[in-house]
From Swiss-Prot:
DNA binds at H93, R111, R156. It catalyses: Hydrolysis of DNA containing ring-opened 7-methylguanine residues, releasing 2,6-diamino-4-hydroxy-5-(N-methyl)formamidopyrimidine; 2'-deoxyribonucleotide-(2'-deoxyribose 5'-phosphate)-2'-deoxyribonucleotide-DNA = a 3'-end 2'-deoxyribonucleotide-(2,3-dehydro-2,3-deoxyribose 5'-phosphate)-DNA + a 5'-end 5'-phospho-2'-deoxyribonucleoside-DNA + H(+). Monomer. This is Formamidopyrimidine-DNA glycosylase. The keyword Zinc-finger applies. The gene is mutM.
Length: 275
C-alpha cells in the first residue's frame, strides 16, 4: 500500500505538470472504486485550472477554483503522467484520465481500493472533509514533536508500533516506516506506548522524520505495485535496516533480525539494538 513517502513522491512528480494547467476533460471509465466517483466530477473539472497539489497524510488534494478533487491511491493505485501524443490505449485497470493539452494524468488501480472524490469550495476548507479532519499531525510539521507523542500516549497499553500506525497522532507512518523508525530510535516495537519516556519519544520523532525523508529521497518503497508518476519504482526497501530482513544479521550489531506479528502485520526488529 502506498504510504506517505510514496504519495509525496507522486505529488512531487505530478505538480510541475498540472499546476497552472487547465483540465480539458475527464474520462471516467470505472466509477465504482472504494467509493463511487461523483457523477458530476467530469463536468465540475472541465476547463478548470489546477492551482496546486497538496498532500494530507496519504491523500492528494488537487485544488481548482471551484474546490478540490481528492485522490487516495488505496492499496495498488498509481497516478502516471503520459504524453498526450501517442498515449497508450487504456487498459483494464486504467479507470480515470484527466486530459490536459500536452499530457494525460492516468489513475490506475487493479484492486480498486483507491478513491477519487470531490469537495466543493462552498462546503468549506478541504481539511475539514470527514476523511481528513481526524488525521494526526504531519511528520514534517513543527507540531510533530516527541512531547506530542509522549503526551498523547500517557496511560496507553497498546504497543508503541501500533500507536504509530493508528494515524491519530501522526500521519503516514506505515508498516515499513514504523519498523524502520523504531529501529533508528532504539525502541523495541512491543513496548507499551505509555511506558516510553519523553527523551525516547524525542529520538523517535527525529527518527520518523529521518526515515520518511530518506524514503522520499529514494523514490519510496516498491514491494509489489507502486511506481511514481514517471513509471519508476522506489528503492528504499533495498536499504532497510530491519524490514523484511528476518534472520539476517543486523546492519549495526550483527544480531539476527527477528520477525513477529502485531495486529496482523509483520514487525521486524533487532533484539540487541532495540530495548
Amino acid at each position: 500500500m502506498p504510504e506517505l513517502p510514496e504519495v509525496e513522491v507522486t505529488r512531487r512528480g505530478i505538480e510541475p505538470f498540472v499546476a497552472g494547467r487547465r483540465v480539458e476533460r475527464v474520462d471516467v471509465r470505472t466509477a465504482m472504486l472504494r467509493w463511487p466517483v461523483p457523477a458530476g466530477l467530469a463536468e465540475q473539472l472541465r476547463a478548470r485550472e489546477v492551482l496546486a497539489v497538496e498532500r494530507r497524510g496519504k491523500y492528494l488534494l488537487f485544488e481548482v477554483d471551484a474546490g478540490w478533487f481528492i485522490v487516495h491511491l488505496g492499496m495498488t493505485g498509481t497516478l502516471r503522467v503520459l504524453p498526450a501524443a501517442g498515449v497508450p490505449v487504456a487498459a483494464k485497470h486504467d479507470h480515470i484520465d484527466w486530459i490536459f493539452d500536452e499530457f494525460v494524468l492516468r489513475f490506475r488501480d487493479p484492486r480498486r481500493f483507491g478513491a477519487v472524490l470531490w469537495h466543493p469550495r462552498e462546503a468549506g476548507d478541504v481539511h475539514a472533509h470527514p476523511l481528513l479532519a481526524s488525521l494526526g499531525v504531519e511528520p514534517f510539521s513543527p507540531a510533530f514533536t516527541g512531547a506530542l507523542l509522549h503526551a498523547r500516549t500517557r496511560g496507553r497499553t497498546v504497543s508503541v508500533k501500533q500507536a504509530l500506525l493508528a494515524g491519530d497522532m501522526v500521519v503516514g507512518v506505515g508498516n515499513i516506516y514504523a519498523s524502520e523508525s523504531l529501529f533508528r530510535a532504539g525502541i523495541r516495537p512491543t513496548t507499551a506506548a505509555g511506558k516510553v519516556s519523553l527523551p525516547r519519544y524525542e529520538r523517535l520523532a527525529d527518527a520518523v522524520r529521518a526515515t520518511l525523508a530518506d524514503a522520499i529521497e529514494r523514490g519510496g518503497s516498491t514491494l509489489r505495485d507502486f511506481v511514481g508518476s514517471n513509471g519508476e519504482s522506489g528503492y528504499f526497501q533495498l536499504d532497510c535496516f530491519v524490514y523484511d530482513r528476518a534472520g539476517q544479521p543486523c546492519r549495526v550489531c550483527g544480531t539476527p533480525v527477528r520477525q513477529i506479528v502485531q495486529g496482523q502485520r509483520s514487525t521486524y526488529f533487532c533484539p540487541t539494538c532495540q530495548r
